From Swiss-Prot:
Domain of life: Bacteria
Record-annotated FeoB-type G domain positions: 3-169
The protein's name: Fe(2+) transporter FeoB
Binding site for GTP 2: G35, V36, T37, V38, E39
Family of this protein: Belongs to the TRAFAC class TrmE-Era-EngA-EngB-Septin-like GTPase superfamily. FeoB GTPase (TC 9.A.8) family.
Amino acid sequence: MKKLTIGLIGNPNSGKTTLFNQLTGARQRVGNWAGVTVERKEGQFATTDHQVTLVDLPGTYSLTTISSQTSLDEQIACHYILSGDADLLINVVDASNLERNLYLTLQLLELGIPCIVALNMLDIAEKQQVRIDVDALSTRLGCPVVPLVSTRGRGIEALKLAIDRHNANDNVELVHYAQPLLREAGFLADAMAQEMPLQQRRWLGLQMLEGDIYSRAYAGEAAQNLDTSLARLKDEMDDPALHIADARYQCIAAICDVVSNTLTAEPSRFTRAVDKIILNRFLGLPIFLFVMYLMFLLAINIGGALQPLFDAGSVAIFIHGIQWIGYTLHFPDWLTIFLAQGLGGGINTVLPLVPQIGMMYLFLSFLEDSGYMARAAFVMDRLMQALGLPGKSFVPLIVGFGCNVPSVMGARTLDAPRERLMTIMMAPFMSCGARLAIFAVFAAAFFGQNGALAVFSLYVLGIVMAVLTGLMLKHTIMRGEASPFVMELPVYHVPHIKSLIIQTWQRLKGFVLRAGKVIIIVSIFLSAFNSFSLSGKIVDNINDSALASVSRVITPVFKPIGVHEDNWQATVGLFTGAMAKEVVVGTLNTLYTAENIQDEAFNPADFHLGDELLGAVDDTWQSLKDTFSLSVLANPIEASKGDGEMATGAMGVMDQKFGSAAAAYSYLIFVLLYVPCISVMGAIARESSRGWMSFSILWGLNIAYSLATLFYQVTSFSQHPTYSLICILAVIVFNVVVLSLLRRARSRVDIELLATRKSVTSCCSGTAGNCH
């Protein structure tokens, strides 16, 4: 079979991702475009004659970029297409928005690269009574047009057949440009490198006349002739860019008049009716908060019901199983305990997180594919405008509920450097999936029936602190107004199950692999430090270990937030959590259960792997029945109650160490708000600078320590009023000083704002191949 590389390109919300998932299934690889942190997805699939590598290009409305302050999407798409890596392009077109989508189609066809138009979302078009003559559209465009409903898999085989058959587009003159434009485009094309096809050189000439700033990178000496061409055109037409766009739109209008009835089509009545409620100025925000609460409720309840299978199952295999092997093969006791506690305990920490994290990713994917996430940005627009940000900036913040890294990277879709930087500074406060793993454990141990409510309050607190951070920046070092907010609202539709599963699987796999490697390594590292004293001797009691001795010295720093000296394990969790937040659970699990593992005698004769696995399945089945019982459906928060049988395990030890729910909640506040994990720090440094990364870390530490101290000291004020009053006043005075210093620093910061993406804007300024 011949190998073929295909670029998949289309407007946002055209169903491109769904088609990508339909074609490639789970055979996907996710990376970054060279030099930038924009995600690059590749997948594999086969047709009758070809083994295809499919490259998913960023969603974009056109290939023209007129400002360096815009997003990188157009730049990356343009560079990849001109690089020559793609043998064929598949342009995904939304049939229900044909006229707008055809602008990008015309730009692609003008390049002369073999192209297939995938006419997607025909089911939505039919509901809106839009009729399209596919054969007539194919004739007018000069390339194959394949009708699709990607959510149902309709038309996939026809698309594969078109891939095998299509080698070149028909020689059709699509757009009739004014003669002066063609003359100057030809003049610029003649000055370019002759090894580039003439059609592409003329296209680049038109792009330069239109004001595209990145086409000049390919023009070579022709870029020096641009001013001459524009000067000649000035005598013949007012605005060359306007004439170019007008010619394309006239072509699109002529095509649509012949092939469709879009002028008489009806908009979706269902979408319009639902939007009257969802986008209501009074109901929109409460509905958004309810949707977020529902997500946490389902993640904790249903995910929690599935947890025994992963928890007890991993204990049976990776802890008791390792102990059985160690005793059977006569390993030294210290080695058996080390392997069971370090390696086995690390795996046992990761796997029980899978159900709840997986449920959250599934819910987020559903919201994204259904069309609700775009509405959430509009709902939050008024609030974001108060911060001097457009509502569009809330979209990457919502992504932060899954992971803060793509949230930080998503800020590059914003236009102004100030808006990008403010969004980056706010992103780490959005509670990610790794933090949910921590919250779920503490909710079960301390908050009983109010567990889901406690978790929801932490998520809301994260949003509030992100907003307050934005307000602080607006009134101190980043004053300014928001740019206008224009965003397309896709119609509502039921997400495709296969696409949901693939998206959830990709996210969950990334989380498990990333978290697993770190947690297992940290667990082994902690087990080693927990087994020896500072003098290097093996200890019988972990309280005499090197880890305990060092941690006790540091723990008094956290006394104001409710971490007492004997709870040194919690201090270790905060430090390891800086590597990855999910490691906090692994650290606490390893340290709180260390004594139990040392003290418990393991009898190999009593170990029966099959019985323990059957017990895990039985517990899971019982949990599922309880979760979906009538009593729980009537009172869903009941399903998140803590398990009293865990009193002798890690949760029981944790309960004793913290002493109260107030101390535990204060600890969670600190975990929510303090330093982001290493991967997020790296993303912040790449998207802005190391200086802004340092600012984000210091600001997060201050907010976390201040808020956790205020909460704990207020709730425990009656126990030590004098100490609490001193702590509260110290926090207030310190923050007043910090805000005063930030206001004075404004004049020095403003100059540096435009430089925050200096390395990014220049990353693709060379040859086309540099961006792939």
